[in-house]
Amino acid sequence: MPEFLEDPSVLTKDKLKSELVANNVTLPAGEQRKDVYVQLYLQHLTARNRPPLAAGANSKGPPDFSSDEEREPTPVLGSGASVGRGRGAVGRKATKKTDKPRLEDKDDLDVTELSNEELLDQLVRYGVNPGPIVGTTRKLYEKKLLKLREQGTESRSSTPLPTVSSSAENTRQNGSNDSDRYSDNDEGKKKEHKKVKSARDCVPFSELASTPSGAFFQGISFPEISTRPPLGRTELQAAKKVQTTKRDPPRETCTDTALPGKGQTHKLAPGRSLFIPSESSYDRCVEKSSSPSSQREFAARLVSAAASPSLIRETTTTYSKDIVENICRGGKSRAQPLRAEEPGVSDQSVFSSEREVLQESERSQVISPPLAQAIRDYVNSLLVQGGVGSLPGTSDSVPTLDVENICKRLSQSSYQDSESLSPPRKVPRLSEKPARGGDSGSCVAFQNTPGSEHRSSFAKSVVSHSLTTLGVEVSKPPPQHDKIEASEPSFPLHESILKVVEEEWQQIDRQLPSVACRYPVSSIEAARILSVPKVDDEILGFISEATPRAATQASSTESCDKHLDLALCRSYEAAASALQIAAHTAFVAKSLQADISQAAQIINSDPSDAQQALRILNRTYDAASYLCDAAFDEVRMSACAMGSSTMGRRYLWLKDCKISPASKNKLTVAPFKGGTLFGGEVHKVIKKRGNKQ
């Protein structure tokens, strides 16, 4: 009778399967974990080494001994080839230096010598759902592990045989057990922390749109992150302590009056306000984040989270802690205006309490998922740039936001309380005519209105943020005469835009491309607004009556007038196409703003639901790609309108010129390069005409 191993775990998975098949043991369907085959080996093969009534069939050592020295299998003489190979495997396994010892066999384990992964594994074995183990939380978890080991609540029973009826369960469990550490394949030799990291790898969305035309943006992929597990006992206690430590409810912070538009509705109906300001409770927590350094910080945190989600776990709390501690050390006197309404509470006590809240939050890791935190900060900065401010649910969110509110409130110490009480300035409607101011003209008077100053400040803020995000440096123009003007932030004409303009100006008489397929509108609006207006019948009647009397008019003049009319019609068509594109981009941009607001609300209300927010951000990426392509189409239509108007002006100026019709046609359709109406072609024509004379 062949004798089998008492500890079959030393065999590889393939060897176990071959031994089971050789001894007529039915294997479960599909690929199973190694523990499954070990249990089958113990039940069907190892049990044959003993009488049927022998106890401890599934034990890993002889039944008569319980000491650790007798856990190794006893050599058996006279075994066959297969048993000899098994003993050879045992010998090789005993001398292998890369195998990790079984932590559960060590009763006198020193928790201080464990790595973060081993400490996490031990806590999981005791049924604890720990959070991230970093330098600030390791001592807490070491004490918890020692306490649990003293209570002796760890279950030392053998791994139960899982059911193999559900293929989905087998797929979920395959590759996630600890038996990979004891196998001889290459995957089993890898360290355990690599398996933990594989669950957090960045997986880009497959549905992301391609890179937009113009090479403005690079492809962006949002990683998929797993849902954060429920808070553990220590985290819940820390969260309760944070809530009880708060001494006052969150107050409305000072709003940035330089940024306009705290409204929520845009109305496109004629005669109504295009932007309606409103006073709501959502206008909170607006931080002054338009500086290049702060925007670069948000973008860097988002990129680092996408590249390595585990890195942001430590940098998030460190980032907030450094801001608060720097302000607490040097900004006591600066923050006094914000605390003026509470004379009974000293600034030092407030700062100390806020420091305790921040340190307790850092120790207990009461933070939202790293990627959600970075996305939320970045989206909030974009919303601040757009004048939306904070979103609903910000003040009633998780305690993590209290830390951010501390940073925002302390960083806004340069503002005055009176600014937050001032009503929003009224943005003038498009239908309103500005007051005339002396000889400066209506345009200058309109620019001096308070609303236009807000819009100009808003435009400067958006342009500065966009330039910083794209990494574009604005060159300062040289001072003109004795007047030194501050350089205004502005977008340069990118080479891709100039290329589109040059292509259209090379042949200004070409047929306009149709945009009806990509930007469709209703037939009624197309006929009334987008189509070139027809000449009234009454005017045509007058012209027909005057034609016989003008029969002596030169045919060249009539041809010039017709070409001029055609050029003006082409200009109208190009402008109508640009209007058609702009109407579509307006609605898509409004939808994009709503999607970003919805994603920010989801992240603020439930940070663990990052998947839904990422799906919304995926839609916003598609919308942004659409806007980029539409912008280039609008640039093309604008270039066509400029070329057509230039051709019309050429016909008008050449109408009475005494040159040949062929020369006129050549000059009117010559490529346009800007600067002068005819460019260098006029010199060639004049030179030829002089040579003929």
From Swiss-Prot:
Residues with the N6-acetyllysine modification: 655
Subcellular location: Nucleus; Chromosome
Gene Ontology cellular component terms for the protein in this record: chromatin; nuclear envelope; nucleus
Stretches assigned to the LEM-like domain: 5-48
UniProt main location, coarse: nucleus
UniProt entry keywords in alphabetical sequence: Acetylation, Chromosome, Coiled coil, DNA-binding, Methylation, Nucleus, Phosphoprotein
Region (Disordered): 48-113, 148-211, 227-270, 332-351, 412-442
Biased composition (Low complexity): 412-422
PTM field: Phosphorylated in a mitose-specific manner.
Region (Linker): 49-107
Domain LEM: 108-152
Superkingdom of the organism of origin: Eukaryota
Annotated family: Belongs to the LEM family.
Assembly notes: Homooligomer. Interacts with LMNA, BANF1 and RB1 and with chromosomes. Associates directly or indirectly with lamins at specific cell-cycle stages. Interacts with CMTM6.
PANTHER family assigned to the protein according to its UniProt record, in alphabetical order: LAMINA-ASSOCIATED POLYPEPTIDE 2, ISOFORM ALPHA, LAMINA-ASSOCIATED POLYPEPTIDE THYMOPOIETIN
Description of its domains: The N-terminal part contains two structurally independent, non-interacting domains: LEM-like (also called LAP2-N or LEM-D) and LEM (also called LAP2-C or LEM-B). LEM-like binds DNA while LEM interacts with BANF1. The C-terminal domain forms a four-stranded coiled coil.
Protein name (database record): Lamina-associated polypeptide 2, isoforms alpha/zeta
